[in-house]
């Protein structure tokens, strides 16, 4: 008879996925959103109609579905990403609903913008769930880097080629108008081009790290290696000139510079890139009237407070009215600012929530950005690192451009505030961005699968007992 004693098997407990914490935070975001709606209704002397209750139920159902998609297909995703974005989206809905109440009093439109924004939120969350479900590995995107780059360029170019009646609004040719709705393709271009930049920088890293001459302590790239930077410069200046969209131009170009710097760790690329952009902007200032007008309005908006400077002047008055603590939700007059639900929603929050409330909102964005950068640090592959860092940096740059524009720190650009401003294109694109970031986060936090070693200590080895019969 032979008896074989097996070695004990060590069982490692699975790492916590923290999905229950995410669900709890989502419920907290829903409570804050609904409470803010009640405050608006109370301060506007409104009742609590069924529509308001349906907003809260729909909000909780939508993000509960997104939570289930993450729990099933990406359980190791950072638990803070979705709840923080849900809260930002909810606060945006509250402000849009608050502006609807004013519009209804003066009879400007029949269809509330909050209902349309809720519909776009449904589309955005559905897109988020689809990306989380079907994008099994973020590294698959690197295979389609050149296709994404070509698609991103096409999306940028189409509005410039269309007639003004189909693409121009408020002086910028950035739209594609279709029957029943409009699309702003630049919102999707920023994601597609970031995928392209990340894939190319991983595959062609040597092209960007080749040593050249030294100047002022910096290692300059070789002249023949400047082609990618010059191409990005031409594209960004072309968008600024032909589509009259300074915001998209600045966002795309600075995002490219950030990714290049992260890939090469050479500050010379940033210096050369910013010098080229400044030179292009200076030339455009003297040649093109719309660029010159935008800069002059930024420098002195009170020179024409009822004309070209009206938007920024009203925005500054809103911040001044809000002060430190704000007038309270529903108690201010944010409707006096043009485009308060889109380009100037930050000014609307600044008036009714004050500096304290606006700082809290900016801290929510900071949480998303920092968690995205932490994901980039934790990711094991180079493509994922660059893409996660690029997506997070794009959010940071866009937020800086928006806040800087409405506070007159930089020229007004017309970019929307992610997840808060009214608009389907921005909402849909940013939920896709969040889904990709969530997928990268899942890959970074997921425990590695390791095969057990064949070697075992002598004490755990099998023994044989041979019995004579």
Swiss-Prot record:
- Pathway participation: Cell wall biogenesis; peptidoglycan biosynthesis
Q: Which domain of life is it from?
A: Bacteria
Q: Which residues carry this modification: Phosphothreonine?
A: 463
Q: What is its EC number?
A: 2.4.99.28
Which Gene Ontology BP annotations are present?
A: cell division; cell wall organization; peptidoglycan biosynthetic process; regulation of cell shape; symbiont-mediated perturbation of host innate immune response
> Which residue ranges run through the membrane?
20-40, 50-70, 76-96, 115-135, 146-166, 183-203, 226-246, 248-264, 267-287, 312-332, 344-364, 386-406, 418-438
Q: Which GO terms describe its cellular component?
A: cell division site; plasma membrane
Give membrane topology per the record.
Multi-pass membrane protein
Q: How is its activity regulated?
A: Phosphorylation at Thr-463 may be important for modulating interactions with other cell division proteins, thus regulating the cell division process.
Q: Which GO terms describe its molecular function?
A: glycosyltransferase activity; lipid-linked peptidoglycan transporter activity
Q: What happens when the gene is disrupted?
A: Deletion of the gene does not impact in vitro growth, but it leads to aberrations in the cell length. Deletion enhances sensitivity to nisin and vancomycin. Also exhibits hypersensitivity to moenomycin. Mutant shows compromised bacterial virulence in the host.
- Posttranslational mods: Phosphorylated on Thr-463, probably by PknB and PknH.
Q: Which reaction does it catalyse?
A: [GlcNAc-(1->4)-Mur2Ac(oyl-L-Ala-gamma-D-Glu-L-Lys-D-Ala-D-Ala)](n)-di-trans,octa-cis-undecaprenyl diphosphate + beta-D-GlcNAc-(1->4)-Mur2Ac(oyl-L-Ala-gamma-D-Glu-L-Lys-D-Ala-D-Ala)-di-trans,octa-cis-undecaprenyl diphosphate = [GlcNAc-(1->4)-Mur2Ac(oyl-L-Ala-gamma-D-Glu-L-Lys-D-Ala-D-Ala)](n+1)-di-trans,octa-cis-undecaprenyl diphosphate + di-trans,octa-cis-undecaprenyl diphosphate + H(+)
What the entry lists under PANTHER family is as follows: CELL CYCLE PROTEIN, PEPTIDOGLYCAN GLYCOSYLTRANSFERASE RODA
What family is it from? Belongs to the SEDS family.
Under which name does UniProt file this protein? Peptidoglycan glycosyltransferase RodA
């Amino acid at each position: 008879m032979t008896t074989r004693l097996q070695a004990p098997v060590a069982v490692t407990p699975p790492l916590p996925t923290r999905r229950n914490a995410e669900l709890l935070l989502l419920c907290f975001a829903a409570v804050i959103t609904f409470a803010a709606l009640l405050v608006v209704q109370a301060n506007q002397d409104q009742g609590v109609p069924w529509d308001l209750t349906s907003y809260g139920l729909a909000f909780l159902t939508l993000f509960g579905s997104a939570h289930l998609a993450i729990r099933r297909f990406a359980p190791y995703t950072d638990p803070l990403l979705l709840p923080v974005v849900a809260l930002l989206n909810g606060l945006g809905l509250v402000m849009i609903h608050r502006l609807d109440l004013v519009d209804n009093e003066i009879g400007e439109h029949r269809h509330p913008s909050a209902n349309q924004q809720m519909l776009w939120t449904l589309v955005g969350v559905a897109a988020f769930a689809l990306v989380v479900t079907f994008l099994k590995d973020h590294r698959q995107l690197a295979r389609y880097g050149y296709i994404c780059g070509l698609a991103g360029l096409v999306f940028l170019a189409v509005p410039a080629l269309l007639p003004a009646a189909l693409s121009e609004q408020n002086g910028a040719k950035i739209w594609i108008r279709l029957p029943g709705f409009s699309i702003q393709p630049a919102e999707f271009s920023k994601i597609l081009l970031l995928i392209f930049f990340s894939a190319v920088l991983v595959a062609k890293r040597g092209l960007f790290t080749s040593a050249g001459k030294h100047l002022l302590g910096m290692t300059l790239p070789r002249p023949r290696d400047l082609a990618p930077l010059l191409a990005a410069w031409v594209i960004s200046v072309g968008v600024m000139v032909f589509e009259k969209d300074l915001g998209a131009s600045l966002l795309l170009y600075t995002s490219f510079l950030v990714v290049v710097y992260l890939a090469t760790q050479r500050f010379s690329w940033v210096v050369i890139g910013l010098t080229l952009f400044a030179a292009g902007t200076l030339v455009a200032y003297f040649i093109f009237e719309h660029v010159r007008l935008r800069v002059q309005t930024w420098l002195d908006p009170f020179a024409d407070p009822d004309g070209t400077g009206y938007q920024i002047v009203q925005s500054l008055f809103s911040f001044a009215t809000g002060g430190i603590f704000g007038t309270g939700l529903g108690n201010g007059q944010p409707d006096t600012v043009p485009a308060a639900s889109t380009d100037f929603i930050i000014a609307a929050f600044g008036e009714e929530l004050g500096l304290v409330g606006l700082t809290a909102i900016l801290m929510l964005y900071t949480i998303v950005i920092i968690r995205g950068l932490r994901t980039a640090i934790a990711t094991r592959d180079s493509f994922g690192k660059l893409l996660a860092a690029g997506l997070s940096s794009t959010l940071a740059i866009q937020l800086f451009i928006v806040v800087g524009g409405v506070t007159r720190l930089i020229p007004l650009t017309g970019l929307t505030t992610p997840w808060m401003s009214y608009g389907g294109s921005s909402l849909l694109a940013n939920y896709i961005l969040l889904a990709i970031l969530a997928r990268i986060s899942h890959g970074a936090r997921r425990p590695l699968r390791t095969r057990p070693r064949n070697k075992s200590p002598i004490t755990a080895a099998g023994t044989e007992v041979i019995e004579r019969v």
